[in-house]
């Protein structure tokens, strides 16, 4: 590739073919980075005659010469990421050697998913037809600096403190505003 750095951007809220373009260019790249979004997005690739659907992993993951980076702007749902790695590993091979994830990525929690669902069902909010996967609420936490990030999982004390503080906020919202049952701490700590 002649360019030292190349960005592939979509300006139409998805479905422009960014993943296919990145896949095509990854043969000649050292690395490709997914810089934002969550597992609501998706791109379909054909690799060695097999259909692959990616949601969190950059499409460069199928190219053994390119590192695949997940940047700090991505909100990560651990279950979805692990399932995707498990599904793609037999096809792409050596994923963990090529995959790098920013420790500053926000982790999507069960309370994000619940809030997303409650907002979509509520008449008090203008619904936008989300995928109900907690992407928007996770970004709300990121912007308000209360998000649980990957790096927080390295310290059980810090992780539990952050989860307790954030869960108290969400439980107040669930109970007082939506009239719903509070989430138990164990319901959110399982993702780590």
Task: Give, region by region, the residue ranges found by the protein language model.
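Glycine-rich nucleotide/cofactor/substrate-binding loop typically near the N-terminus or early
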Residues: 36-188
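N-terminal phosphate-binding or glycine-rich loops at protein starts, especially the Walker A/P-loop
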Residues: 4-37
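Conserved small/polar residues in nucleotide/adenosyl-binding loops
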Residues: 191-192
């Amino acid at each position: 590739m002649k360019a030292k750095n190349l960005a592939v951007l979509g300006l139409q809220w998805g479905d422009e073919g960014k993943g296919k373009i990145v896949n095509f260019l990854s043969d000649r790249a050292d690395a490709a980075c997914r810089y934002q979004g969550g597992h609501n997005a998706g791109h379909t690739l054909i690799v060695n005659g097999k259909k692959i659907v990616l949601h969190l992993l950059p499409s460069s993951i199928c190219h053994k010469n390119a590192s695949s980076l997940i940047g700090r702007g991505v909100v990560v749902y651990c279950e979805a990421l692990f399932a995707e790695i498990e599904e793609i590993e037999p096809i792409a091979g050596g994923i963990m050697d090529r995959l790098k994830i920013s420790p500053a990525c926000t982790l999507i929690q069960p309370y994000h998913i619940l809030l997303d669902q409650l907002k979509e069902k509520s008449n008090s909010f203008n619904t936008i037809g989300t995928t109900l996967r907690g992407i928007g609420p996770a970004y709300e936490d990121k912007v308000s600096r209360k998000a649980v990030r990957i790096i927080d999982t390295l310290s059980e004390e810090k992780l539990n403190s952050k989860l307790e503080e954030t869960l108290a906020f969400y439980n107040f919202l669930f109970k007082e505003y939506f009239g719903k049952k509070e989430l138990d701490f164990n319901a959110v700590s399982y993702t780590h």
